[in-house]
């Protein structure tokens, strides 16, 4: 039996990892360029059979539709007959990593011209990049390749564009993006939600409810509020003989590694009054032969929340320190080049290794995720299992952030029908020595630049340098942006279906496509892939719905003391916490979240409201075994109590099944699909496009103020 090397991957695996598949050398019915992709890791699942059936039905439906299209266009195609015993010579594939790297397109896009020569609709899609700033080069390049008309200075005719690409979340987004049919690449409030402390609050709430599911995040303390808790943890660890514990201090507003330092005692914190995060340091990272610490930047895409759809990019980045790692001690803990993987920090070190070619990056300070997966695989690491676990981290982290994403969307587009928001996210993951992935941070605006600065000979980077092409960034970011645009415009299936060719009659273009064998750079991981595995974590949206009934969404996203008192009265919880005691409890919770004992009229954020719910649930349902069961009982109790006011929290989320292909879609804000906010002329609207927004104001049921 012969052995062929395949770099093709199914959409659930990182690009470029190497797999072997045995093919008989004389078996002309199975050309070597059609080798079966590597199979992704599967753990025993209970309810995934339904999702597999859905996927199969969807595949069969697409194939039938494709056959119809090919049949209709067959008389217009230039055909090339290929006899079974005269198959075209396949692309040469070598088992060496170098040959694979050499055969890959340097830009991350197919070598063939991909500029669309035809429209997929009655008009061409448009994109506004006037606020893209540093993202503009890559976005413009991808737009051109896809055939999107770009407006780098905005449209002079004041007509809306199909896509708006911004480099940051703009406070006046609702004034810039006025059409519900448009797509914009940022969710309102996402910058704040992804900050270190806000992210920690989101994950901490889920850890209380699902401790085993959220063990991938290090122990964390928010200062100054949690200083006493941090001291208590440290004393307990010392009593248990853990004398070599180290912690990492991160300013909440910090970025690119600024202001970060290591400590091994609470007494070493430089400013206990500063708003900052202290995390347990991962002192046992997985290392390779070069003994350099590294982490992964994995890219996720939230396609929409209506319906909810989360994707992962098959290719990511591995970022390496520039000095060899040793466990921190009093002699080396200040050497950040050995402890922090941040590119912005390490690029200033003379030991930083830039990569001019894909072959160079196998030893560079910035490498492809797939390259490192191959290197780890050769050392016996089970990379399929690792990739499976990393994707679950992306899903679980996004679900933890989801309630507040919904809240900020409703607040920002309170008086308007909002557009479809989508967002590329960067998830920083480190691997422990035992192969366990740990989430470090989430970046709401990961860099999409595809170049870097190389210092002039004999000078340091601080003295300036020359901006040159970054081959690693190109291979990662160009397909990422390109496929994200295809995804939100509904062009993904059309583009990649052309690679699944049947029959013996192929056009010349089809033969070129066979050689390229491109696969989608993005694959859906929720709800399609991991819906059965993680669907139970989609839980706190009911709490968010109740929360929004008592918040003045037009002007605020926090709940005031008056709102909490109204919640206690209308949910019949006065026997648990009398209204006169609410203010004292609010002060206690507010200090835990802000470090201030007085609310100053700002109210409590959502996760502080959750702490209030947890407190009530613990007191009201003492016979339940765990907090999750108690909170479930409390939410059901509140739901029943609020029905007399015309409110049902169970209506927040709505799942719909497409009867044609059996695909399940979960709408997190179904009220935006139905009626206007005032409740007048409340009739169901037809969907107009993927925005899932009707041509009317969104509706969120309000509580009847009459008791």
Curated annotation (Swiss-Prot):
Compartments, record wording: Cell projection, Axon; Perikaryon; Cell projection, Dendrite; Cell projection, Cilium
A GO MF label: ATP binding
Residue span of region Disordered: 675-707
Pfam families in the record: TTL (PF03133)
Compositional bias per record (Polar residues), positions renumbered to this chain: 677-696
Enzyme class of the recorded protein, top EC level: ligase
Primary site of residence: other
Superkingdom of this protein's organism: Eukaryota
UniProt keyword ATP-binding, yes or no: yes
Keywords: ATP-binding, Cell projection, Ligase, Nucleotide-binding
Tissue specificity: Expressed in amphid sensory neurons. Weakly expressed in body wall muscles. Isoform a: Specifically expressed in ciliated sensory neurons in the head, including the IL1s, OLQ, head CEP, and amphid neurons. In the male tail, expressed in HOA, RnA, and phasmid neurons. Isoform b: Specifically expressed in male and hermaphrodite IL2 ciliated sensory neurons, and in male-specific CEM, HOB and RnB ciliated sensory neurons.
Phosphoprotein as UniProt keyword: no
Reactions mediated catalytically: L-glutamyl-[protein] + L-glutamate + ATP = gamma-L-glutamyl-L-glutamyl-[protein] + ADP + phosphate + H(+)
Functional description taken from the UniProt entry: Polyglutamylase which preferentially modifies tubulin. Involved in the side-chain initiation step of the polyglutamylation reaction. By controlling tubulin glutamylation, regulates ciliary specialization and motor-based transport. Promotes the formation of A and B tubule singlets by splaying microtubule doublets in cilia. Together with ttll-4 and 5, required for male mating.
Similarity remark: Belongs to the tubulin--tyrosine ligase family.
Protein name: Tubulin polyglutamylase ttll-11
Organism: Caenorhabditis elegans
Lineage: Eukaryota, Metazoa, Ecdysozoa, Nematoda, Chromadorea
Protein's gene: ttll-11
């Amino acid at each position: 039996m012969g052995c062929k090397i395949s770099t093709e991957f199914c959409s659930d695996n990182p690009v470029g990892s190497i797999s072997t598949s045995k093919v008989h050398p004389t078996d002309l019915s199975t050309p070597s360029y059609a080798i079966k992709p590597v199979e992704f890791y599967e753990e025993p699942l209970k309810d995934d059979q339904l999702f597999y059936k859905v996927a199969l039905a969807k595949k069969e439906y697409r194939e039938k539709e494709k056959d119809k299209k090919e049949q209709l266009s067959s008389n217009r195609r230039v055909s090339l007959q290929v006899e079974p015993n005269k198959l075209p010579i396949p692309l040469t594939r070598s088992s060496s990593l170098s040959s694979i790297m050499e055969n890959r397109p340097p830009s991350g896009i197919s070598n063939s011209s991909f500029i669309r020569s035809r429209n997929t609709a009655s008009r061409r899609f448009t994109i506004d990049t006037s606020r893209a700033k540093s993202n503009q080069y890559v976005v413009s390049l991808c737009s051109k390749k896809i055939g999107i008309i770009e407006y780098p200075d905005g449209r002079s005719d004041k007509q809306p564009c199909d896509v708006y690409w911004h480099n940051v979340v703009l406070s006046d987004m609702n004034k810039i993006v006025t059409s519900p049919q448009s797509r914009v690449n940022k969710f309102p409030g996402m910058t704040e939600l992804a900050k270190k402390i806000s992210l920690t609050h989101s994950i901490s709430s889920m850890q209380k409810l699902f401790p085993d599911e959220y063990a991938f995040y290090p122990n964390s303390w928010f200062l100054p509020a949690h200083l006493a808790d941090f001291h208590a943890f440290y004393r307990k660890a010392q009593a248990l003989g853990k004398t070599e514990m180290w912690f990492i201090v991160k300013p909440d507003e910090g970025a690119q590694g600024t202001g970060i330092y290591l400590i091994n005692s609470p007494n070493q914190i430089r400013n206990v009054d500063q708003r900052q995060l202290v995390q347990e340091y991962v002192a046992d990272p997985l290392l390779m032969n070069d003994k350099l610490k590294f982490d992964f930047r994995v890219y996720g895409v939230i396609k929409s929340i209506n319906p909810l759809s989360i994707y992962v990019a098959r290719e990511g980045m591995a970022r390496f320190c520039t000095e060899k790692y040793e466990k921190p001690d009093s002699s080396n803990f200040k050497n950040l080049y050995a402890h922090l993987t941040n590119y912005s920090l390490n690029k200033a070190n003379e030991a930083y290794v830039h990569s001019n070619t894909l072959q160079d990056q196998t030893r560079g300070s910035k490498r492809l995720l797939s390259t490192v997966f191959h290197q780890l695989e050769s050392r016996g690491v089970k990379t399929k299992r690792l990739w499976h676990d990393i994707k679950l981290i992306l899903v679980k982290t996004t679900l933890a952030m989801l309630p507040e994403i919904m809240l900020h969307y409703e607040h920002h587009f309170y008086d308007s029908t909002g557009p479809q928001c989508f967002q590329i996210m960067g998830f920083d993951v480190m691997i422990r020595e035992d192969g366990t992935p740990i989430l470090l941070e989430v970046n709401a605006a990961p860099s999409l630049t595809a170049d870097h600065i190389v210092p002039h000979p004999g000078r340091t980077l601080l003295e300036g340098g020359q901006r040159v092409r970054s081959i690693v960034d190109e291979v990662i970011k160009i397909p990422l942006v390109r496929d994200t645009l295809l995804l939100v415009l509904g062009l993904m299936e059309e583009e990649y279906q052309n690679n699944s060719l049947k029959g013996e009659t192929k056009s010349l273009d089809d033969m070129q496509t066979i050689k390229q064998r491109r696969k989608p750079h993005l694959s859906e991981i929720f709800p399609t892939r991991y819906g059965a595995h993680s669907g139970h974590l989609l839980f706190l949206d009911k709490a968010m719905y109740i929360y929004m009934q008592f918040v003045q969404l037009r002007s605020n996203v926090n709940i005031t003391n008056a709102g909490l008192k109204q919640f206690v009265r209308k949910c019949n919880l006065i026997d648990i916490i009398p209204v006169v005691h609410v203010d004292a409890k609010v002060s206690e919770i507010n200090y835990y979240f802000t470090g201030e004992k007085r609310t100053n009229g700002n109210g409590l954020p959502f996760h502080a409201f959750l702490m209030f719910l947890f407190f009530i649930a613990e007191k009201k349902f003492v016979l339940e075994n765990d907090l999750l069961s108690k909170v479930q009982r409390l939410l059901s109790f509140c739901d029943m109590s609020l029905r007399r006011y015309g409110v049902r929290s169970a209506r927040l989320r709505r799942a719909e099944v497409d009867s044609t292909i059996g695909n399940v879609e979960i709408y997190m804000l179904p009220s935006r699909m139905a009626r206007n906010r005032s409740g007048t002329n409340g009739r169901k609207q037809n969907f107009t496009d993927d925005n899932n927004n009707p041509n009317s104001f969104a509706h969120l049921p309000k509580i009847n103020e009459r008791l």
